[in-house]
């Protein structure tokens, strides 16, 4: 070494400092080496600066870490190939590694063992590595590379979690296989980032379990994807599972992501068939099973026919069991489901499922007017009557805009106070007209049937039906159960909502009077609305007696519109609806209930929504707590991984220092052994000189 480097010579310096092992930095030697080689030499670096970043770094280095600059002629004839040990010009120094792959573009992948990493370099950034023995340069042998499935530099895919729910795969490069606590792990580099470095760009690799690694799928050429093909989409730097939902122009597809249900438009090049790595073999991914509509998963709803659009469904015969006695005891025995359905001709057409079905009893109430006087259907379930001050006697027994108020008998045969008052106002012509009802029945029924359905209803055995059944409106014959009010308007019965209410209604079927006359055309339009047929209402509007007379009907109309509007609003509620909105809707329905609206169903639905929202809020809070714990656990796990990586690096450094110390010890022992031999030789020479001296001194004169 003394013959090759001197003060002022350009040298290369290495170090055992963590993070700088196997790296050589250029510098200028500022003092001559000593003969003993034990004194540290001062070196001024050419590429490293002090902490102030202004002046060159100067250090005192042990001679064993200093070597001459390799001469250019030593590189002649060396071809860089896979397995060649090289030095790479990187971060102001020459870093020693091994070429693991030569790319077609003339670039090279270089593997470093401490710390483990793989970096891509240009050819002009590399030089063959030479080792200085102290008096000459030595070339390392070509290293044999591992060619296993997950060897260093192999492209693979690593699983990750996207949106906290979906398992996706991102391309990665295997850096090194390691073993931690007896478990096999891999150090990988995300290949979505550039492998080349520029400036002070810093990147960290990841240490992952072997279960999260799979080989890169081989190319599965697909000329064109079909609808519902299960594919993988390269989106957001990862491969995610999806289904082809649309084939577009320009070789593009609309794909539905399986987990998030997003439907992005992607190019053909960003798709590949869905494959699964199982038992060391690529298998086809799970197929999409088409959903088959069955009676269990498809809601079937039969629309109701309005009176004007329904076909004639009048039964061809009636039964004697259709008779209803106005006596309470007899009616309690005879009014059963079978008898009620027999009275309607055993019709089987159903209304919407949530309103009425075949098992719902149909209630038939006594009628007091000829069927010829039936007016358009009104939405009230209770009987209505024109206020007394608007009545006028109808002496001819024919339909007129103003009907004479006629009382209605109770189910038990008694008369209430209203009946008493009305009977006092009736005249003899009224009684005569009532006796003529049976004779006028057939012609009146024909007239009403033609006006409602446009067809002639066939009526048989009408003589076997009691007067109350004969006077039913035609809507009852087309499976639209009704009652007829005192003013001859058929009224839809909401018997689906209260099936157990039949006996009570039979016992307490008293006359109820609306606080207004139905003059508005709204009531006719109301009948044709589908929602009104699905959820019919019969409010009594009794609180409106306290309102001004001219405001009563329009207030009632507003309430009807508000009720069905609120029903629609409840139906369209979304998951993010606020509890205050639900509370406001509940209060609105409670206010409508005071006017006789049946709000049990919407109130029950609102209460259930509030309960579900409370439960959802609790689950969300529970999930939030778990997410925090998971995040804390992941951070703690990463901390342990970093600590283990640091310990591994320290172990590697200690092993390297051990090797260096062993080499130094062997060299020192060799020198010491030589010096001992030389010392013995000198001792022998000294002894010889002593003997010669004595011989000389004792020689005779």
Curated annotation (Swiss-Prot):
Which portions of the chain have biased composition (kind: Basic and acidic residues)?
326-340, 403-412, 421-430, 437-449
User: Which named protein is this?
Assistant: DUF724 domain-containing protein 6
Function, as annotated, reads: May be involved in the polar growth of plant cells via transportation of RNAs.
Entry's InterPro entries? Agenet-like_dom, Agenet_dom_plant, DUF724
Q: List the disulfide bonds.
A: none
Q: In which tissues is it expressed?
A: Expressed in roots, stems and flowers.
Q: Which CDD domains does the record cross-reference, listed alphabetically?
A: Tudor_Agenet_AtDUF_rpt1_3, Tudor_Agenet_AtDUF_rpt2_4
Q: Does the keyword Nucleotidyltransferase apply?
A: no
Region of interest called Disordered, as start-end residue ranges on this chain: 299-353, 374-452
Q: Which gene encodes it?
A: DUF6
> What is its subcellular localisation?
Nucleus
Residue stretches making up the DUF724 domain: 514-700
Q: Which UniProt keywords apply?
A: Coiled coil, Growth regulation, Nucleus, Transport
Question: What Pfam families does the entry give?
Answer: Agenet (PF05641), DUF724 (PF05266)
